[in-house]
Amino acid sequence: MSRHESRKLSDDYEVVDVLGKGGFSVVRRGISKSRGKNNDVAIKTLRRYGYTLPGAQRSQPGQRGLSPLGMPTLKQVSVSDALLTNEILVMRRIVEDVSPHPNVIHLHDVYEDANGVHLVLELCSGGELFDRIVAQDRYSESEAAEVVQQIASGLAALHKSTIIHRDLKPENCLFLNQEKRSTLKIMDFGLSSVEDFTDPIVALFGSIDYVSPEALSQRQVSSASDMWSLGVILYILLSGCPPFHAPSNREKQQRILAGDFSFEEHTWKTITSSAKDLISSLLSVDPYKRPTANDLLKHPWVIGDSAKQELIEPEVVSRLRSFNARRKLRAAAIASVLSSKVLLRTKKLKNLLGSHDMKSEELENLRAHFKRICANGDNATLPEFEEVLKAMKMNSLIPLAPRVFDLFDNNRDGTIDMREILCGLSNLRNSQGDDALQLCFQMYDADRSGCISKEELASMLRALPEDCVPADITEPGKLDEIFDQMDANSDGVVTFDEFKAAMQRDSSLQDVVLSSLRTI
């Protein structure tokens, strides 16, 4: 990875539309200036907040391998920097030992600048695994077996190089292109680990639906943990729903730890015993009893000898569509929460602003000035933010404006979200009861529609100070619980009545939300 200022990402690529955003990254489509439009790439920008990568040499395009990086330990950096460090280390190993492989994303190049580290990756334009599946009216066991075969092939190559993915799920499996016979690629190695090489990031953000029993109980995680995740994916492909149903996250964890799933639902009657036997072996609580990726590549069901050609029940496809839609909604909301440096930002804000106590009328005036001054709706540039502070006669805060602005410029695009900064500033005042709830709600009801989206609700939690964050907030699935409790009718938006009812039902939930309005 190069630190030569003479070579910049913009020298080699035209960066165009945004393809997706994650908790600590953004992916954009790039066009090679030397090779033209037929060589589009995906440029994943990993934002960093705490440190600058030490001087390291970037491999030139086409070279195998990235030079060693002298990294600090993960405990010395923030979560976002840990993810950045981890993904670079794992991608380096993939380039050295795995690439090129038809079922593993390929890294073309790496750049670094003040905005972060840019990974230039193979562009996968064929869509996510489940999106592609549910676009069909029906599919067969044989087609599901082809999916498993491709994922197993990628895992076999990764595991041979002692790389554990640790976060295998449908959204991390993308088709290379729109062709019917497109290859499927495993991607997103931010939570991966290289055995005896990197410090794994344990149990932070993985969806609990795919997490193995040993990962939940914080025992040794191995390549067998990836095989468990593949077993869950296969179960969902053949039934349309995850194997471990439970009314609460805690009960779901207990079922996973016990390996408590079944094939009793009526659509399983049409599925071959070979497929069910394979799922049972992959979902064995004992990791040593699970087949390896290489074992799967020789399994009669996976290679097509025993997988049925007949189409699966339409009910399965319908359930999978519903599951997939809800999964995507949650993923967007959770990414919104994670993108805000949940454990760091509010304390930094308080340190900057000291004892400046924002009153309710000041917050409302601030909103009005944002609306009047900002050319781009709810987003403000630094000069616009400084103009807002001047209009509010907050002269003492103007010298701090660049530092406050930087705290809220999540994707380093030179703008901040007015709603985020209002919620952040509201941490410095006291409030309680319905007024506090209404204030929270109105902060993010930007269009005064009377309801807020899941993404907006997630954003509301961004400003939580570390002291007020529940101890188990980073446990897999905990954020899912919060969203489920809010959205009573599962329609993707939350009315004030739903919001208030959720607070009244669960005092611990009220503590979480109202923490954003209390003095820290």
From Swiss-Prot:
UniProt domain EF-hand: residue ranges: 361-395, 396-431, 432-467, 474-509
Catalytic activity line of the entry: L-seryl-[protein] + ATP = O-phospho-L-seryl-[protein] + ADP + H(+); L-threonyl-[protein] + ATP = O-phospho-L-threonyl-[protein] + ADP + H(+)
Chain ranges of the Protein kinase domain: 13-302
Regulation: Activated by calcium/calmodulin binding after calcium-induced autophosphorylation. Autophosphorylation is associated with a time-dependent loss of kinase activity sensitive to reaction pH and ATP concentration. In vitro inactivation leads to the formation of network-like structures.
InterPro entries tied to this protein: CDPK_Ser/Thr_kinases, EF-hand-dom_pair, EF_Hand_1_Ca_BS, EF_hand_dom, Kinase-like_dom_sf, Prot_kinase_dom, Protein_kinase_ATP_BS, Ser/Thr_kinase_AS
Locations listed in the record: Membrane
Binding site for Ca(2+) 1: D409, N411, D413, T415, E420
Similarity comment: family membership: Belongs to the protein kinase superfamily. CAMK Ser/Thr protein kinase family. CaMK subfamily.
Function: Protein kinase that may be involved in microsporogenesis.
Protein name: Calcium and calcium/calmodulin-dependent serine/threonine-protein kinase
Protein's gene: CCAMK
